[in-house]
């Protein structure tokens, strides 16, 4: 796999956004907001798990993600690829296959005891591990996985995702504070631009989504349920 034979990052972001729209992984609804795991409302929702059911798109995006990591981290930067339970497991396996590296996965909670209680597969002390997930919002769950990886004696300074919300400034800063670099293919801004170009949603909905993206905390406060 030769990184220079692929599109630049901006074009890969546009193509990724288009593929997510094509498989209807993107949902916008400002009138009846989605409730996130945090309990906060959002007019946007994305389901990257759907990608595993679309082989051509899945393969293309895994090529894109692998190339992005190689461009930004290097050709020989890792010894092990770890998928985060649950959504990151298939994508971790696909990236590991492309890089010809061992694959492991990290549990959300320990199973049993000892420093390897959250790790399935073989992860050796000193190995340089790339954590792969489907998406990130604020980076919080990634740090929990990184902590579990580091407990084994391995190192983890990089995480790769297909989709990053790209609207919460603390995402990359919180990861960076723990020595973790985030690699991603596209954000809500890329999806919004491509949705406008395709006419995927009506102008009122797209306008409401843009308002949210510009100040998500204020939008969430204004749309909180009592």
UniProtKB/Swiss-Prot annotation:
Record field: catalytic activity: orotidine 5'-phosphate + diphosphate = orotate + 5-phospho-alpha-D-ribose 1-diphosphate
Organism lineage string: Bacteria, Pseudomonadati, Pseudomonadota, Alphaproteobacteria, Rhodobacterales
Pathways involved: Pyrimidine metabolism; UMP biosynthesis via de novo pathway; UMP from orotate: step 1/2
Protein purpose: Catalyzes the transfer of a ribosyl phosphate group from 5-phosphoribose 1-diphosphate to orotate, leading to the formation of orotidine monophosphate (OMP).
Reported cofactor(s): Mg(2+)
GO molecular function: magnesium ion binding; orotate phosphoribosyltransferase activity
EC number(s) per entry: 2.4.2.10
Entry-linked NCBIfam families: PRK00455.1-3, pyrE
Residues reported in the UniProt entry to bind orotate: 137
Chain residues that bind 5-phospho-alpha-D-ribose 1-diphosphate: 107-108, 111, 133-141
Family: Belongs to the purine/pyrimidine phosphoribosyltransferase family. PyrE subfamily.
Record-level GO BP terms: 'de novo' UMP biosynthetic process; pyrimidine nucleobase biosynthetic process
Domain of life: Bacteria
InterPro entries: OPRT (IPR023031), Or_phspho_trans_dom (IPR004467), PRibTrfase_dom (IPR000836), PRTase-like (IPR029057)
Top-rank EC class of the record's enzyme: transferase
Protein's UniProt name: Orotate phosphoribosyltransferase
Alphabetized UniProt keyword annotations: Glycosyltransferase, Magnesium, Pyrimidine biosynthesis, Transferase
Quaternary structure and partners: Homodimer.
